[in-house]
Amino acid sequence: MQQIIYIANAESENIEVWILYNNGDMKLIQTVQTDGQVQPISIIKNTKLLYAGIRPKNRVITYQIDKNGLLKKKKESIVPGTPNYISFDSSEKFLFCSSYHADCISVSPLDKNGIPKDPIQIIHNIEGCHAAKFNSKYNVLFITSLKNDCIYLYYLTHFGILKSTEQKLVFSQKNSGPRHVIFHPNQNFSYTVNELNGSVDVWKISKENKVLEVKNIQNIKLLNDLISKKYWSSDIHLTSCGNFLYVSDRYLNSISLFHVNKNDNTIIFFKQYLTEEQPRAFCIDRNNNYLIVIGQKSNKLSVYKICQKTGELKKINQYQTGNGPLWITSFLI
């Protein structure tokens, strides 16, 4: 099995394809021009398709991933508004595209070849709609509204139409700016990074008498007891074992490591690491061995070895990327 890392470079208008070797070394094997600023990229594993959001023409380009991890363009599809985040439902029949600038989320069915059709639903007035992530256990789409300090909650119907849950939405702290959302492997807890106040919210998800309840159980700062005059937090990821959570901040140029409490899934600050300049995104490889950070300003990536016992990071490699790297994801072939 070979691990492939894909990096979206907005200013260079391309996607880079890298091999990640078992020892943490990397090698660039392909650069694909995107004819526009590429931002979010997301992969459906079963069909080996990569989807890339392109601006300013507001498109999603579908690429086929071959046996070596290389990309071949298949089709372009139109989406409403500048794409900021691409995700899918658990059956991988529907594509969700968030648009921060258009304040909307769209739902596009995928045809038999995995190509997005025209949207069947567009929900407007989600101010600062930054990300959407599907919880398969509860059949709920979590949609972050950065400008309104809230997360909208929608059930997904059989035909792909989103319907408000009984709770409709949950609020984060005022002027916090919820940006990205992830789920614990057990799907009963969600973690959101707040861009504007440099914090993480932990949410407990449950159902009582078939009614969904999402409840905030913790808010914790990225710097523990230290205080910064400004925050610009960006990305959040959890190891697949559910033990270690990492959060990046572009103003602090840092990665914060938290330990996940196995009893209640709250998090405990452990350590902060200085990293690439303006670390907009990072990913954890499929084996939880490496964390790879891209610097939007440094135009470089750093590879960190993850300690399996503590989650601590040790920098082992650094490479030059294209200009303005905004997104990174991994794939196992």
From Swiss-Prot:
Similarity-based family: Belongs to the cycloisomerase 2 family.
Catalytic reaction annotation: 6-phospho-D-glucono-1,5-lactone + H2O = 6-phospho-D-gluconate + H(+)
Organism: Buchnera aphidicola subsp. Schizaphis graminum (strain Sg)
Signal peptide: none
NCBIfam families per the UniProt record, alphabetical: PRK11028.1
A single GO cellular-component term on record: cytosol
Biological process per Gene Ontology, one example term: glucose metabolic process
GO MF entries: 6-phosphogluconolactonase activity
Disulphide-bridged cysteine pairs: none
Protein EC: 3.1.1.31
Known role: Catalyzes the hydrolysis of 6-phosphogluconolactone to 6-phosphogluconate.
Domain of life: Bacteria
Sorted UniProt keywords: Carbohydrate metabolism, Glucose metabolism, Hydrolase
Metabolic or biological pathway: Carbohydrate degradation; pentose phosphate pathway; D-ribulose 5-phosphate from D-glucose 6-phosphate (oxidative stage): step 2/3
Protein name: 6-phosphogluconolactonase
Claim: Hydrolase is one of the keywords in the record: yes
